[in-house]
């Protein structure tokens, strides 16, 4: 298989974890910000997580530099465009990007400006390249909840025209879903699709709760259903897709090594698995890398790869017309 040429779908990719290091330097110059260094190798080292981190929280420290520069409309539009450009250039045909709008208000940007900027960057890339995309609004579980409704209302102006879904992300504690039930309900009332980060840090119960309490149609990671039979059966029975991110799952210690990743066992048992990058820069990866790692580690055939590709298409938060277009690459 030529992994670069294969059509690819990425349903789980974070904007602030996928910024080009050179762009950090460029934007810092434009914004008169002082970086710890102007050496791109030093900047890259600060943005890329080690191959294995002690835990997820250590991995999340790599988002500090992007957060510093992602505070203007111009920066957000550029970073959005470049991410879709990078994906298109390795034959990613459809990309869903998630980001936390509340993280980009340090300099007073309005929620409307934030949403407009990322969608504008994406649409510019869609016009220039053979790629389609959408945005997912991520709320960090640790942030105050009083702004969540405002985020959802601002995003609703672009609903199904660049923004499609609601997500909860960040450090994961057991039982977090209970306190977010009203917000997930409100998101659904507005017309958002639901995907929730859960089961990345040891709590299979969180996956069960994400589906049963929050109405998750997809789950970010979901690794720890392997030791929670009720969550496992719910995912399987409800055909909830898992957004697995192999390199990231190894880095954050969700699994000890790629060979121990449950993606193939899940797949063979009929669970809807997908292959995704999570954070292209922080995990120093591409979709080409992720596909190669999974295909080679688990000896997948080309037919099995295209089956997983089709699972990704069927679970994408996009229109039937776009899905038909994406399925044409698998024929």
From Swiss-Prot:
Cofactor note: Binds 1 zinc ion per subunit.
Positions of substrate binding: 14, 16, 170
Function: Catalyzes the hydrolytic deamination of adenosine and 2-deoxyadenosine.
Membership in a protein family: Belongs to the metallo-dependent hydrolases superfamily. Adenosine and AMP deaminases family. Adenosine deaminase subfamily.
Keywords linked to the UniProt accession: Hydrolase, Metal-binding, Nucleotide metabolism, Zinc
Binding site for Zn(2+): 12, 14, 197, 278
Enzyme class per UniProt: hydrolase
GO molecular function: 2'-deoxyadenosine deaminase activity; adenosine deaminase activity; zinc ion binding
InterPro entries found in the cross-reference section: A_deaminase (IPR028893), A_deaminase_dom (IPR001365), Ado/ade_deaminase (IPR006330), Metal_Hydrolase (IPR032466)
Catalytic activity: adenosine + H2O + H(+) = inosine + NH4(+); 2'-deoxyadenosine + H2O + H(+) = 2'-deoxyinosine + NH4(+)
Site description Important for catalytic activity, residues in chain: 221
UniProt-listed PANTHER family: ADENOSINE DEAMINASE
Record flagged with keyword Zinc: yes
Highest taxon, organism lineage: Bacteria
Cofactor(s) needed: Zn(2+)
Keyword Coiled coil among UniProt keywords: no
Protein name from the UniProt record: Adenosine deaminase
Pfam families recorded: A_deaminase
Organism in which the protein naturally occurs: Vibrio vulnificus (strain YJ016)
Active site positions: 200 (proton donor)
EC number in record: 3.5.4.4
This protein's GO CC annotations: cytosol
Gene Ontology BP annotations: adenosine catabolic process; hypoxanthine salvage; inosine biosynthetic process; nucleotide metabolic process; purine ribonucleoside monophosphate biosynthetic process
């Amino acid at each position: 298989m030529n992994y670069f040429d294969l059509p690819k779908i990425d349903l789980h990719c974070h904007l602030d974890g996928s910024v080009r290091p050179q762009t950090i330097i460029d934007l810092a110059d434009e914004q008169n910000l002082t970086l710890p260094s102007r050496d791109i190798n030093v900047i890259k080292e600060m943005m890329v997580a080690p191959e294995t981190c002690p835990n997820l929280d250590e991995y999340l420290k790599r988002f500090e530099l992007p957060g510093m520069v992602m505070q203007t409309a111009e920066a957000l539009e550029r970073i959005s465009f470049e991410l879709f450009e990078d994906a298109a250039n390795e034959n990613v045909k459809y990309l869903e990007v998630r980001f936390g709008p509340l993280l980009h208000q340090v300099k007073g940007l309005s929620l409307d400006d934030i949403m407009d900027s990322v969608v504008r960057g994406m649409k510019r890339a869609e016009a220039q390249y053979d790629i389609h995309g959408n945005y997912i609004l991520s709320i960090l579980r640790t942030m105050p909840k009083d702004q969540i409704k405002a985020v959802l209302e601002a995003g609703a102006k672009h609903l199904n025209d660049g923004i499609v879904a609601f997500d909860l992300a960040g450090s994961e504690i057991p039982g977090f879903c209970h306190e977010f039930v009203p917000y997930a309900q409100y998101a659904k009332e507005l017309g958002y699709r639901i995907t929730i980060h859960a089961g990345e840090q040891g709590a299979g119960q969180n996956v069960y709760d994400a589906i049963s309490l929050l109405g998750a149609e997809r789950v970010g990671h979901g690794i720890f259903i392997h030791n929670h039979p009720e969550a496992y059966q719910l995912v399987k029975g409800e055909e909830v897709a898992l957004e697995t991110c192999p390199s990231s799952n190894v880095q954050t210690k969700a699994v000890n090594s790629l060979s121990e990743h449950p993606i193939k066992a899940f797949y063979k048992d009929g669970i809807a698995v997908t292959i995704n990058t999570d954070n292209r820069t922080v995990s120093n990866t591409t979709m080409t890398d992720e596909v190669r790692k999974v295909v080679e580690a688990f000896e997948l055939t080309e037919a099995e790869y295209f089956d997983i590709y089709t699972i990704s298409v069927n679970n994408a938060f996009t229109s039937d017309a776009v899905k038909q277009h994406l399925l044409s690459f698998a024929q």
